[in-house]
Amino acid sequence: MFTATANECDKPVVLSVDNILNAVMAINSRVECTSDDIVLAQISLHNEFGFIYSLIWPLYNGAMVCIGRGLRHVDADTYYYNPTILIGTPSMIDYQRAISGFNKELNTIIIGGASCPFRLFENLCDSDLKVYNIYGMTETSGCVGVNELYDGSYTLFDNNAVSIADDGEIIVSGPCVMKGYYNDVESTENVLKDGVYHTGDYGRINNAGRLVLLQRNPDIILLPTGEKISRVRTNEQITAINGVAEGFIIFYNIRLTAVI
């Protein structure tokens, strides 16, 4: 599995079978999937969210998995396979909503790869769909918490695995944490200390014991497509262009924008 870190855009992450099975058990504790379900896999399976949530998890529960052909055919694939559970990123699910791309058999939507905007979450819930937004990253097998409430807070899959550091950083331990970055001890030791993963995200635990995200890792740009971009590395590449004195990337009107 690959992810982006503060200094690299394509960083290989080592996940074990135990990591993946722990994620499956965590999902099963909050979301129902049975042998009667049909799951449409429309996210690339080299992506941790797509691999675990749209392939391994449903297969473990005996559900039928249908492999989609990508975003270009997502509406046709949805009506062809008639899934009961749909897995997607915020941008993918929002696109399907906009084109009325949900089949009548659909009852559950799982959104991951990025935080689900409140507008989209509210709209889906108003359609009598069960909606779950997953919080996690590749380094934690994609299973830290799940949101199914309008307030945007996350129920933790394991209350003992998540804590808040003195500076507000969210840190994660336990069986969901990766083994490390592939063949890179130094990068691993920078974020994984005594088995505790430092996410770079910031948050708090509310009175109900739910996780509230306050800020995502400022060194990484997380797109609604679920893609991650190293802010530092991308800024360096822009500045290295001949004739560019200074450049950086920002979000402007919910769009990724380069300022040069």
Where are the language model's segments positioned?
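Conserved AMP-binding A3 loop
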Residues: 1-25
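Active-site glycine-centered loops adjacent to acidic/histidine catalytic or metal-binding residues
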Residues: 5, 113, 136, 174, ...
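Structural detector for helix-capping/boundary residues
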Residues: 17-18, 43, 160, 195, ...
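Conserved AMP-binding/adenylation subdomain of ANL enzymes
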Residues: 21-38, 45-85
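Phosphate-coordination loops involved in phosphoryl transfer and adenosine-cofactor binding
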Residues: 35-36, 105-106, 194
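Gly/Ser/Thr-rich phosphate-binding loop
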Residues: 84-88, 96-150, 245
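Conserved ATP/PPi-binding loop(s) of AMP-dependent carboxylate-activating enzymes
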Residues: 130, 149, 155-156, 165-191, ...
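AMP-binding/adenylate-forming catalytic core of the ANL superfamily
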Residues: 174, 179-180, 202-260
